[in-house]
Amino acid sequence: LEQGYDTSCGMSVVATALDLYWGEPATETGIITATLGGAVDSGLYTVSLADMAAAFAAYGVAARAFKLDWEGLNAVVAKGYSPIVVHYERPERHFALLLGFKGGRAVTADPARGLESLSREAFETRYSGSAMALASKALSVDGALVDRAVAEAAGRHERLESAASRFALRAGR
């Protein structure tokens, strides 16, 4: 789901994870209202991982924050914990969902940029090292949807690379 406000990426990530991947109806505005106590009109929606964990808990999803590097994120995804909330520091503070890895690339659902396939270097340039794993006894993630999103982003990247290679070959003639 695309974030509706300049500073609402955290609540948009919560709504996307719940609504799209966990199948629990949720909206960004509803999460903001419930979590920030009616502050929808204030325009101030910047939140922390702790605020996001509280929002997830209200829907029966446990959230635990970790400091993880690239390998640690790969290990958590390999154990079936996907999507994972990731925090970016660059180019500005921001939250996204890490859906998985394919072909040495991280696939993210970014509330401002959409579905992305990022090289390790591009991901690590943005990533702060803070992530949050999610789990629930009552709800389950639509793993097939996560897998399709990862495959779609990876396929899009492969098609772009192929087109760029063909263009470079033609330009070199």
PLM features: what roles do these ranges have?
Residues 129-173:
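Low-complexity, Gly/Ser/Thr/Pro-rich intrinsically disordered linker/tail segments
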Residues 1-40, 158-160, 170-173:
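Active-site-adjacent structural segments surrounding the nucleophilic cysteine of cysteine proteases
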Residues 2, 24, 28, 71, ...:
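Glutamate identity and glutamate-enriched acidic tracts
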Residues 34-136, 141-144:
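Conserved active-site-adjacent core of cysteine acyl-enzyme catalytic domains
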